């Protein structure tokens, strides 16, 4: 069970640390905390000026960084919902994916890439970018062939099914979606 007092204490501590250190990274961290308050706390917070300023800061930061590192990739992967679906979001997604390919030798590469792909597949499918979505699903399929990456197989099956469903093969799509749901339930989760 979540302890709201503990969570509030951590949030306050992180904000205090961020305010004490006036560095670009501390300002970015404060902006992320501000955005996450509305995602995990109060959705009405999205209308506040603090949320809008934080959203703008994160978007501007990601646009202004010329060379992304793991840190920028993770920020985009976690905060991609801040960008409206469309060319800008797709461009940032492709930038993150291409940048990650440069880190193939890094031991966390498969996890970072899976996280990025899963977080962006739904918007790609909803916006009709089926070719790019198919490429992302194929990459996930390749990544989940490794036994250490099995946790990513359920979202891969789900999005593969959703893609099949919307591109003209509803029977196969529903079959994959139901399979993903069954696996998820077997692991003790609700879908």
Which residues does each predicted region cover?
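Short, charged amphipathic alpha-helical surface segments
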Residues: 1-44
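Helix-turn-helix repeat elements of alpha-solenoid scaffolds
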Residues: 2-15, 45-56, 85-98, 127-138, ...
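Amphipathic alpha-helical segments of tetratricopeptide repeats
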Residues: 14-19, 56-63, 97-105, 137-146, ...
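Alpha-solenoid helical repeat architecture
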Residues: 22-32, 68-74, 106-116, 146-156, ...
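"A position-specific structural signal for the A-helix of alpha-solenoid helical repeats
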Residues: 29-40, 74-79, 118-123, 155-166
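Alpha-helical adaptor scaffolds
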Residues: 72-150
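Residue-level detector of the short coil/turn that links helix A to helix B
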Residues: 128, 168, 187-188
């Amino acid at each position: 069970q979540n302890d709201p007092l503990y969570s509030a204490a951590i949030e306050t501590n992180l904000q205090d640390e961020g305010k004490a250190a006036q560095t670009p990274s501390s300002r970015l961290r404060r902006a992320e905390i501000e955005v996450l308050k509305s995602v995990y706390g109060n959705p009405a917070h999205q209308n506040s000026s603090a949320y809008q300023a934080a959203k703008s800061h994160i978007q501007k930061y990601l646009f202004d960084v010329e060379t992304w590192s793991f840190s920028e990739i993770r920020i985009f992967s976690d905060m991609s919902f801040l960008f409206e679906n469309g060319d800008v979001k797709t461009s940032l997604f492709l930038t993150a994916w291409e940048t990650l390919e440069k880190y193939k030798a890094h031991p966390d590469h498969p996890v970072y890439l899976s996280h990025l792909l899963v977080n962006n597949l739904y918007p790609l499918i909803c916006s009709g970018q089926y070719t790019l979505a198919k490429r992302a699903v194929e990459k996930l399929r390749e990544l989940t062939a490794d036994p250490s990456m099995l946790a990513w197989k359920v979202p891969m099956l789900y999005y593969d099914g959703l893609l099949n469903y919307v591109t003209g093969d509803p029977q196969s799509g529903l079959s994959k979606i139901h399979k993903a749901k069954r696996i998820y339930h077997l692991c003790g989760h609700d879908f």
